[in-house]
């Protein structure tokens, strides 16, 4: 980590915790026109999916997304890596394969040394190289706070697109990465994160969700999303609302970053936790036995979080094997979808 520059002190928020709260975002989007005039637009903004999908022909559709945010860590290179990993994840979350990226760069050029900005951009480029795609260009502006991210493009078969609206009653919910990223990010901003906790933070946030491409080829994976700024509960609610289903989550089965547990019990976390919980309202019901710290973890804003898959029950073992084979050791079953009103019930 850089000792000379603390990127997290140059911004008011960090990572996907910068997202506007779900309820506020929904209000903002109300006046946007629907997309009925574009029959080849397979996925637009109406279903809260991770990316737009536009059919090119019977065999190919383009997946398009953009994602950017302010620093969640102090090290410039790591910030670039995390932001790029997070942006490309949306392609995988649609079942697609990334093909190209463009950089989005907003930097306080009179405050932040050029060398630090270069490291941020190099970090992003390094992740694109791992993903096997070119960082082909981008756009830069002078901004009061550091902002970095990508436009990412990918390809998917039009019949293999994984939408939030396609989950089915009885589907089992599989989560690919442990929770607690936002909590560790807030701990770092407070200057309380040790080297081991930082390693856990970096390891999970720079792991590309490459398994999404393989999951996209499976008919048994009915819906797929990545868990980011709205937390596990918020993104699960998007699936519930899109598919007209209810969900049941078992808090005791959730994979957690070990270093995040104690900080969560201390009440440390981003402001997005409170905003998310307030936005859920009565759409989320917690069993009395679920402790407050676990409730906060489930609403914690994840940056570059894991994939959440809705899977046919008889294919759960196959899906878990795919996750584990690609290095997602924490992947596990966390709940199920049921017929009912779009809401989430959480039991201990």
Question: Where are the predicted features?
Answer:
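Helix-biased detector of long, well-ordered alpha-helical tracts
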Residues: 1-348
């Amino acid at each position: 980590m850089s000792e000379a520059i603390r990127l997290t002190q140059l911004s008011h928020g960090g990572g996907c915790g910068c997202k506007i709260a779900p309820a506020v975002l929904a209000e903002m989007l109300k006046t946007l026109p629907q997309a009925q005039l574009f029959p080849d637009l397979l996925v637009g903004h109406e279903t809260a999916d991770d990316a737009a999908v536009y059919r090119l022909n019977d065999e190919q559709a383009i997946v398009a997304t953009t994602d950017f945010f302010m620093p969640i860590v102090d090290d410039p290179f790591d910030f670039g890596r995390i932001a790029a990993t997070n942006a490309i994840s949306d392609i995988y979350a649609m079942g697609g394969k990334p093909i190209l990226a463009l950089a989005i760069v907003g930097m306080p050029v009179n405050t932040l040394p050029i060398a630090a900005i270069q490291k941020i951009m190099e970090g992003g480029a390094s992740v694109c190289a791992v993903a096997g795609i070119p960082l082909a260009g981008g756009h830069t502006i002078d901004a009061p706070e550091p902002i970095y991210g990508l436009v990412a493009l990918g390809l998917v078969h039009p019949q293999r697109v994984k939408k939030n609206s396609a989950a089915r009653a009885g589907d089992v919910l599989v989560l690919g990465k442990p929770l607690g990223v936002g909590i560790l990010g807030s701990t770092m901003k407070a200057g309380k994160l040790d080297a081991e906790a930082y390693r856990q933070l970096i390891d999970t946030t720079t792991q590309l969700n490459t398994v999404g491409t393989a999951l996209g080829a499976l008919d048994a994976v009915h819906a797929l999303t990545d868990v980011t700024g709205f937390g596990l509960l918020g993104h699960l609610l998007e699936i519930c609302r899109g598919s007209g289903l209810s969900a049941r989550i078992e808090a005791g089965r959730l994979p957690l970053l070990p270093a995040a547990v104690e900080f969560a019990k201390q009440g440390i976390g981003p402001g997005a936790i409170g905003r998310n919980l307030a936005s859920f309202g009565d759409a989320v019901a917690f069993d009395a036995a679920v402790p407050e710290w676990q409730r906060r973890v489930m609403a914690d804003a994840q940056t570059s979080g894991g994939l959440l898959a809705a899977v046919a029950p008889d294919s759960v073992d196959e899906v878990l094997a795919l996750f584990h084979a690609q290095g997602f050791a924490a992947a596990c079953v966390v709940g199920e979808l049921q017929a009912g009103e779009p809401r989430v019930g959480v039991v201990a």
